[in-house]
């Protein structure tokens, strides 16, 4: 199959969306599919306000169409709802091409947290965007149910995996030697308001709090929490070394759809402490590998008693190979010659 994946999220961003799409590209390519990633670096773009590492590529559906006509895919997946996703959606509708889409990020909740715009105002826009999709792929049963309750159609469960060859237990030493006393309490992720990091940092609890990641709030948090260890963004084996140095992985977010970092921590033998909300409820499904509690300090204290071996065994059941097969099964194949056909909708159709 020749698969075109359109995404506004791509390197140098490092987040769950980029990691998931990278895994899909690699897994599908390994099984013999041809995969083309249509991403912002191929076009003129500007930094996203308040998220400078995110590039917004403002292009026409014609520019997207040129790439589509050159690659001649037999399936198109629109991964994000940004400018590239909008242009690709418009091109597909004009040519009568089926496409699938995905719900990776709870943007309405993020917008509400940052700009105080009610989430209920934003969801109709996302429902419109995904309304013509053959399959709207969502990462967990909770997200599937939530979207269906909001009127989204054709929502399908598409789980997530973890690279167990990279994320695995190791020695508590090396590049991630962490100063401080007591257990090491780790957070990995974007340092931004939607991650609810202050709920973790405000806890009066024994141990050393370590923050791995970068983002718009890092300078402010460094100033307000001088006893917290901030190490910036880490990748690959450097990131793994921080997981290996941790006793508990703390995930304070209330808005994530999944949270790949929780699976990465578990694969390294680190139990998870989180709130009982969307994301953690679908990842930490066994009380042997983590604790979900409205009191995050209780969740941490409980997680400290759990067995690392149980965490590793749990994570090994989540493979990217199975995830890619599910993704591929939802794709809507079409005859590539349709790409060069006449427009079936007017320029104003949506």
Region roles according to the model:
Residues 219-237:
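Nucleotide-activated donor-binding/catalytic signature segment of Leloir-type glycosyltransferases, i.e.
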Residues 124-172, 176, 180:
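Donor nucleotide-sugar binding/catalytic pocket of nucleotide-sugar-dependent glycosyltransferases
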Residues 271-274:
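Short hydrophobic beta-strand element within catalytic cores of glycosyltransferases
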Residues 254:
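Aromatic "clamp/platform" in nucleotide-sugar-dependent glycosyltransferases that forms part
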Residues 305-344, 349:
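A charged, aromatic-enriched C-terminal amphipathic alpha-helix characteristic of glycosyltransferases
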Residues 98-100, 109-128:
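Nucleotide-sugar donor phosphate/pyrophosphate-binding loop at the beta->alpha transition
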Residues 68, 130, 233, 241-246, ...:
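Short alpha-helical donor nucleotide-sugar binding micro-motif in glycosyltransferases
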Residues 176-210:
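Conserved donor-binding/catalytic core segment of Leloir-type glycosyltransferases
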């Amino acid at each position: 199959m020749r698969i075109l994946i359109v995404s506004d999220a791509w390197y140098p961003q490092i987040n769950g969306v980029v990691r998931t799409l990278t895994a899909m590209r690699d897994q599908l390519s390994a099984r013999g599919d041809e995969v083309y990633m249509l991403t912002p670096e191929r076009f003129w773009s500007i930094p996203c306000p308040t998220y400078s590492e995110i590039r917004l590529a403002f292009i026409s559906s014609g520019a997207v169409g040129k790439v589509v006509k050159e690659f001649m895919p037999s399936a198109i997946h629109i991964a994000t709802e940004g400018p590239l996703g909008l242009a690709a959606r418009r091109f597909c509708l004009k040519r009568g091409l089926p496409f699938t889409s995905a719900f990776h990020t709870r943007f309405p909740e993020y917008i509400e947290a940052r700009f105080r715009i009610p989430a209920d105002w934003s969801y109709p826009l996302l429902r419109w965007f995904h309304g013509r999709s053959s399959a709207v792929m969502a990462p967990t049963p909770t997200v599937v149910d939530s979207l269906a309750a909001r009127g989204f159609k054709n929502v399908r469960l598409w789980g997530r995996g973890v690279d167990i060859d990279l994320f695995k237990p190791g020695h508590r030493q090396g590049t991630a030697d962490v100063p401080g006393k007591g257990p090491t309490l780790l957070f990995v992720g974007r340092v931004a308001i939607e991650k609810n990091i202050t709920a973790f940092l405000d806890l009066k609890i024994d141990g050393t709090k370590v923050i791995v990641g970068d983002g718009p709030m890092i300078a402010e948090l460094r100033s307000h929490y001088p006893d917290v260890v901030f190490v910036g963004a880490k990748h690959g084996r450097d990131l793994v070394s921080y997981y290996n140095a941790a006793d508990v992985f703390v995930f304070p977010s209330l808005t994530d759809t999944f949270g790949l970092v929780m699976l990465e921590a578990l694969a390294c033998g680190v139990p998870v402490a989180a709130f009982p909300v969307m994301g953690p409820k679908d990842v930490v499904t066994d009380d042997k590998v983590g604790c979900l509690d409205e009191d995050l300090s209780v969740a941490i204290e409980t997680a400290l008693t759990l067995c690392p071996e149980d965490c590793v065994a749990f994570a090994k059941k989540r493979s990217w190979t199975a995830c890619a097969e599910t993704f591929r099964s939802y794709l809507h194949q079409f005859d590539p010659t349709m790409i060069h056909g006449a427009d079936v909708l007017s320029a104003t159709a949506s």
